[in-house]
């Protein structure tokens, strides 16, 4: 098993799962032991529709292509890479196209599904998106106003209006619940239906989850005679 390109093989371990279940934190732990292609970090954006909020300044497509291909070349030397699956594009209002190698689910040799308790997910979403000051609050509201324009279904427009109202009232926990239910859940379910996980990790502790995945990766690398 493995991915064949340019006459070489590379095993790809993919992390899949809901926004807010700690995939990025787990990926950062795995960087200590494994070659990781961090698409979000390279793009300078998060993988969700709110990806380019606040301090994040997303790269141009040209910069992104150059840097991600450099990381792919580095990973080839190890024969494998760990990647958080982002889909075909990444970003918020503007999007960057992800190379086919990492965009196509079929190229992922092993699929690792990260799940977590609902409360953990919502609290993590709050910690990521809660504005630190009035300026950030204004940015967040404007982001949803722009987002609203991209929706045609009345129920989606109403959901965004409700989210904006909750943000104005500083009810970030309630806003996060609505964001997860109306904006993230369908996208997540669509991706999860496409995969048959080789490993499911219920993430309540990032270090413990990373250790489980680390052991799984090492086991598979042994099977492929890579360690």
Curated annotation (Swiss-Prot):
ATP binds at residues 17-24. The keyword Nucleotide-binding applies. GO terms for molecular function: ATP binding; tRNA 2-selenouridine synthase activity. GO terms for biological process: tRNA wobble uridine modification. Keywords: ATP-binding, Nucleotide-binding. NCBIfam families: arch_SelU_Cterm (TIGR04569). This is Uncharacterized protein MJ0053.
């Amino acid at each position: 098993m493995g991915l064949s390109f340019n006459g070489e093989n590379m095993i790809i371990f993919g992390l899949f799962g809901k926004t807010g279940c700690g995939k990025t934190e787990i990926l950062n732990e795995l960087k200590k032991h494994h070659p990781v292609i961090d698409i979000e970090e390279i793009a300078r954006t998060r993988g969700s529709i709110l990806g380019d909020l606040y301090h994040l300044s997303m790269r141009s497509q040209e910069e992104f292509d150059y840097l991600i291909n450099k990381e792919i070349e580095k990973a080839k030397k190890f024969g494998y890479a760990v990647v958080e699956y982002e889909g075909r594009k990444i970003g918020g209002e503007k999007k960057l196209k992800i190379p086919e190698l990492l965009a196509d689910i079929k190229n992922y040799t092993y699929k690792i599904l990260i799940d977590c308790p609902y409360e953990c997910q919502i609290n993590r979403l709050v910690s990521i998106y809660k504005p630190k000051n009035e300026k950030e609050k204004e940015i967040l509201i404007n982001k949803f106003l722009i987002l609203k324009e991209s929706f045609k279904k009345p129920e989606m427009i109403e959901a965004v209006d409700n989210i904006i109202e909750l943000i104005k009232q500083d009810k970030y926990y309630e806003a996060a619940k609505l964001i997860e239910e109306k904006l993230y859940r369908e996208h997540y379910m669509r991706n999860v239906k496409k995969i048959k996980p080789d490993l499911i990790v219920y993430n309540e502790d990032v270090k413990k989850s990373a250790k489980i995945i680390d052991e799984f990766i090492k086991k598979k690398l042994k099977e492929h005679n890579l360690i």
